Amino acid sequence: MTGCPASSRRRGFGLFFFLRLHRLLLLFLVLRGTLANKLNVPQVLLPFGREPGRVPFLLEAQRGCYTWHSTHHDAVTVEPLYENGTLCSQKAVLIAESTQPIRLSSIILAREIVTDHELRCDVKVDVINSIEIVSRARELYVDDSPLELMVRALDAEGNTFSSLAGMMFEWSIAQDNESAREELSSKIRILKYSEAEYAPPIYIAEMEKEEKQGDVILVSGIRTGAAVVKVRIHEPFYKKVAAALIRLLVLENIFLIPSHDIYLLVGTYIKYQVAKMVQGRVTEVKFPLEHYILELQDHRVALNGSHSEKVAILDDKTAMVTASQLGQTNLVFVHKNVHMRSVSGLPNCTIYVVEPGFLGFTVQPGNRWSLEVGQVYVITVDVFDKSSTKVYISDNLRITYDFPKEYFEEQLTTVNGSYHIVKALKDGVVVINASLTSIIYQNKDIQPIKFLIKHQQEVKIYFPIMLTPKFLAFPHHPMGMLYRYKVQVEGGSGNFTWTSSNETVVIVTTKGVVTAGQVRGNSTVLARDVQNPFRYGEIKIHVLKLNKMELLPFHADVEIGQIIEIPIAMYHINKETKEAMAFTDCSHLSLDLNMDKQGVFTLLKEGIQRPGPMHCSSTHIAAKSLGHTLVTVSVNECDKYLESSATFAAYEPLKALNPVEVALVTWQSVKEMVFEGGPRPWILEPSRFFLELNAEKTEKIGIAQVWLPSKRKQNQYIYRIQCLDLGEQVLTFRIGNHPGVLNPSPAVEVLQVRFICAHPASMSVTPVYKVPAGAQPCPLPQHNKWLIPVSRLRDTVLELAVFDQHRRKFDNFSSLMLEWKSSNETLAHFEDYKSVEMVAKDDGSGQTRLHGHQILKVHQIKGTVLIGVNFVGYSEKKSPKEISNLPRSVDVELLLVDDVTVVPENATIYNHPDVKETFSLVEGSGYFLVNSSEQGVVTITYMEAESSVELVPLHPGFFTLEVYDLCLAFLGPATAHLRVSDIQELELDLIDKVEIDKTVLVTVRVLGSSKRPFQNKYFRNMELKLQLASAIVTLTPMEQQDEYSENYILRATTIGQTTLVAIAKDKMGRKYTSTPRHIEVFPPFRLLPEKMTLIPMNMMQVMSEGGPQPQSIVHFSISNQTVAVVNRRGQVTGKIVGTAVVHGTIQTVNEDTGKVIVFSQDEVQIEVVQLRAVRILAAATRLITATKMPVYVMGVTSTQTPFSFSNANPGLTFHWSMSKRDVLDLVPRHSEVFLQLPVEHNFAMVVHTKAAGRTSIKVTVHCMNSSSGQFEGNLLELSDEVQILVFEKLQLFYPECQPEQILMPINSQLKLHTNREGAAFVSSRVLKCFPNSSVIEEDGEGLLKAGSIAGTAVLEVTSIEPFGVNQTTITGVQVAPVTYLRVSSQPKLYTAQGRTLSAFPLGMSLTFTVQFYNSIGEKFHTHNTQLYLALNRDDLLHIGPGNKNYTYMAQAVNRGLTLVGLWDRRHPGMADYIPVAVEHAIEPDTKLTFVGDIICFSTHLVSQHGEPGIWMISANNILQTDIVTGVGVARSPGTAMIFHDIPGVVKTYREVVVNASSRLMLSYDLKTYLTNTLNSTVFKLFITTGRNGVNLKGFCTPNQALAITKVLLPATLMLCHVQFSNTLLDIPASKVFQVHSDFSMEKGVYVCIIKVRPQSEELLQALSVADTSVYGWATLVSERSKNGMQRILIPFIPAFYINQSELVLSHKQDIGEIRVLGVDRVLRKLEVISSSPVLVVAGHSHSPLTPGLAIYSVRVVNFTSFQQMASPVFINISCVLTSQSEAVVVRAMKDKLGADHCEDSAILKRFTGSYQILLLTLFAVLASTASIFLAYNAFLNKIQTVPVVYVPTLGTPQPGFFNSTSSPPHFMSLQPPLAQSRLQHWLWSIRH
């Protein structure tokens, strides 16, 4: 924007700065004296050089203008630099000009031209002695920002040169001596600045353009490692200066997320992510990391912490760090490469484990607790430690919170409760709360916070702040009045601070009044809430330059004396967007109004008014005389002249549209003439408007005006002119308004056209062509007009034109009679040969002429046909006589042809200059126009002679080849959709997993754009070839099978992996590579075992090895399903005796074709047999004492192992016995861990030898089901027996210390260790071997190697001590073969006293250890056996090698029996088999568990010391569990895992599936009922969920029962509800009863406890006669819906009601009444008794008018005695049904006149005072007859379901309705009889 002239600005702002001008001048003078002039450097050192382009240096002064001078021009020259074309210089360029390689100096003097102050700089020129490379870092990252390297040059004294700009250097990458010999550019590369996204110094950019290198370069990392960069000076003079080297490390830009220090609470965790920066993008790195490992180091435990444990634990696989105790530790990266571990740039962070201190709230945005309705806020609950440091909140923290739902809508809440996205709903003040409650450990153990931490925050919510209007705009008016505007504000707290973002433009007052206009610019006025400045309303205010003005729509014609308001809008036009902004107020601008015709309109009152809603100013004009004028309104402000004009009463010129000049028609034809324009009807007198068309000879033509219902234009006028006789004449058209009083001089326009009526002289017939835009017309009629091609496929439209004798074309010839004919109607014909369709066509001038169209019907046959048109005559009978000489016919010959087609229609062309594609044009007329939809994609050559198109590709692109047939009816061009494409992708299709020595088909295709394949004829232009990474496979080409691909045969020759790629080149030589296909050559797939022997009903699983890795799913099938069956896991179950074959195949589905691909397959022979006999397999029968040996049952053959029969269903039982029990013990397997297996699993036992002797072991195998056919001959049992000899081991009696010998297997090794190693020199040697020296060898360093011969040797070990003493020990070494092995289990399992385990607990981790023995039971000290592990199934037990030799780790994952077999690969007979049974160790059974069930879990497992373990739960929201006692409450449907953990021993679990409760079952004690008597017995309603009848599972201990009632609170699951059954009773049950839920441990069900609330008198009165019961029901909190809700009806007996607390009797009136309301069964059980014999209570009587009212009469027997009684007398009223007991005090009153009257009058006044409205109604009724009253009373009884009875309390007078002179009605009379009169007025009531 440009402002006003400078003079205007100075006038506008002079006043603003005048008062402060002298202060600014004074400050400037002070600063001028204090701020000294300085140069940027005091000394400069420049290098000597002999090559052109000397090194420049820029010298700068801070302020002033200077002249520059050098004292030694031969050494240094100085060139001043002048800025902005002035003569002021603050900079100069120094250039070293020395020609001698010696040190020279010069002084640069800079003199300030105003103050004459002189500055000095010393400049030296010297020779470069050495150079070095300066870098900000020695480490750079792969594919990251480049590193800038700079050369620093030093002279002989070590001084640094000031600049090296312009000197040429040679940069290169040198060999790194510390790294492996690799390609020099493999680690880094040198970049130009033009290749990077960084701006270089100007001189560097210029040098790079000249392919030179300067003193600054960029290097970029390619891959990790070290590299050396070398630089030397290019100038030959400095060739002896040594090159500078720098060694750089290239690292991956890897970092931790988060990377800052973290504070954790004990038990919480944080999951780290590792990411790296690649080309500016962050990419996550998956674990495990390729080059790094994460470690926790420097564990610093807090005071009182356990130093044996770590502060935190790191999970390597997930990078999750879990805090275990207070302290701190460091999480660091460690490079796997040892040489790279010295890198300092690897990320790390510190983790602090702290205690929670307090909580804090934060709210965003704004961080102020003054919020706005409708806005969304993020409320964060932060946890801080005691040092006020924020703690990382992990997902396992639990924070409870309370945000009132009335004020907040929670849109998102995290699980831990720390992060909330809420929406403020309503205004007000509210308090939110949060508490840190617990931490959930990874084992689902919930650890409550020791000291509960709470925090609360007060929040104020207001409505949004809204300012109106939305914006303000004022024109810039520097010398005029200021514009003022009051901004309206709504919402907020009501207290605002008003600010303007630009107070020079807009000033705003504290009341919101803005003032602007004198300074141009924009400003935003903010109304900020004082309570929260972040909450504000804003309005944009613009003071802009006036660019445009316009007069808004208005009335343009007006009567004389009327006034027109011309609204004026003014705008500012944005130069960039061209958008216009209307000003709000421009009324202060002075307007000028001008008119081109003076006196027609005049300006009224100078024309300026206040702005309106749609305009910013206005003016008024008044009409003084008739006419037309141009009103111009202009404004001249700020040297800007703008104007806007409006024309009044104007019309368009009159013109003839059709015809323009002449119309030509045949006799009796019609021409439609169209005229446009002329004066419009005057708006004040439209009736005076006229128009007319006049003819010279009216008898020869007929004229009729056409009135169309909706004309195209309102000022168009249409006439139909019919020729009645031949000839020519002129037609005149006039239009205007007749003169009138208000329009005395109207305009009238006249226009003339010629109308000719003549005979036709000639005709022409041509096909109608739709010529494409821009194409030439068909050339054929010009060359050969008698043979015109037309389409044989489509009907052709033939056009007939008729001409007169002057060759003028007729406008209309529809009166002619014509006849059409075809010479060959088998080729073409006319359906109606006499008719013709007249079609109007524009000739380009706007005049339309009618042409005759006839459709030629074709029969889709090629050929030639002659078409003729004959003129028969006129359609009218009386035709002119001169038609005999007129033309009779016209002929044209047509050629019927096909449409042109392009062959082929679709093609993808390879973009290569050697490619030329030819497309044929088939059929058509032969005259074509060839176009392309896109230019520049191909070169098109149309070869007309060959009727073809040749294309040469230029650039890639998609285009359509369009061929237009110029001489056929145009329905669109013939098209060919073509695509010119470069190589986009190379595609390889093959099976990437190949078994060795097999072949697969390889297909290669080249794809262009849109994945379209190229034809293989282009492959030679692409130099396509296949390349293998290794030679483990071979490729052989095949013959072509299709035109889009090449095929090869791939043969696998060696096992391994390789990569296959396809390579091609484009025309630019760029190489394209396909996606590498990784090919795996895998070993043959095998199923194990090769043969399987089973008995019927026994199961064993087929295992697999080999095949592709990782192995795909194996699909199993069996050849004979009657012998055995196999499932998808490969588990084979025998059925009957026989053989079968199990087939296993590895297959997958091709993602592209969907076909099943079989990689490999194998088979297993299955034999199902019956056991003929059993035998005990004992590896040795002679054993030493105190040893162990396994024994197990086998079949008669070696294939009948325990795998064959030990897993049958029904199974076998094994019973073992011994002849002598004192020689050995025969114990089951796993007895070492205190497991007692059932007899079905005892196929293997362990012999424990105790004493010398001989005994026999016998086993008997029983068949549990004889029909299963498991034993041969249908036997029920088989047995076997074996003899065992136990003898004592050889021992010496003297000395007492028995020598021990080393026992080693054959061909094994053993490393000896002594206790003197490191302290003395220890050596060993073999003294003697038997039978020869090959038994054992020793290397002198303690390594024993056993040979292949069994024998013994003597070993001597010598220790030479440093203090001069030598020690020697001699031991024996025995080498023997291994006879048997034994498997033992760990850890030991302990159970509660009297309890046993028959199986391993589910989830337990087991360790199996293998020990080896010789032939007599001695255990070997070392081993060399290669063991083979086999399982009968792999789905129940996960087993693998342990962390020690000959140990296996197993995890029990499913219930069932798994057989584990171990044997020597070289000696399969040396084996051991053990059963591993897995069962639940947690009780009870959790099947059919429903929401609401309470489960008391228990287990027999204990620790070694008899202590129980710890309970844990996986989903506490599903099964809320007390971790101390192990009791849980099912709170919501789902699946949860209950864990029991005994640390260091066992951790077991059980799955609990909680089902949703279908419905709740309700019941109660039928002997009980409800009443509303206060302090009545509590009513209990029993509820059960599910289908079990009770909700308590398992046996609950007292501690568990206490946890149920105190901790778990299951009653919170249930919501109880009650409701009266009588819907007409307008009393909610919640006012009568208090209901809450509970759980009964005795019954094991939920209970709804219903208690009676205190009730008001009105409520007791209304309920006393209520006939209703009570509905009771319950709902679960988690299931709010009432679907399937069951209600139960509970009897209800209401309490009786009495509203009398006392009864007053007198001497004259000694009889009183007590009225009781109640239901009949309550009234029948009432007992009314007097406390004294002085009063007598008579029997009650019922009111005939009011049901439920009982009246008791009380009479005084002796009034004197009654008056003299010291103690009060009571009438006691009680009922056993409702357990009520009420008392009415009866007291005596002294005799007074009218006492009784006053008493009853008081009752009446009290009643009428309370029911004034009712008494008004009664007063009106009493004025009528008694019969009307009775009818009205009956009506009230009908509408009243529950009477609300008002009983006034006696003795308290109230103001009555009747005055003292009035008499009450007779039915309210105070005279006897009391029972009748009082009853009536007492019962009068209305329904509330």
Swiss-Prot record:
This is Nuclear pore membrane glycoprotein 210-like. The lineage of its organism: Eukaryota, Metazoa, Chordata, Craniata, Vertebrata. Keywords: Glycoprotein, Membrane, Nucleus, Signal, Transmembrane, Transmembrane helix. The keyword Zinc does not apply. It comes from Homo sapiens (Human). It is found in: Nucleus membrane. The keyword Acyltransferase does not apply. Glycans are attached at residues 84, 304, 348, 495, 522, 812, 931, 1445, 1859. Residues 1082-1154 form the BIG2 domain. It is a single-pass membrane protein. Residues 1-35 form the signal peptide.
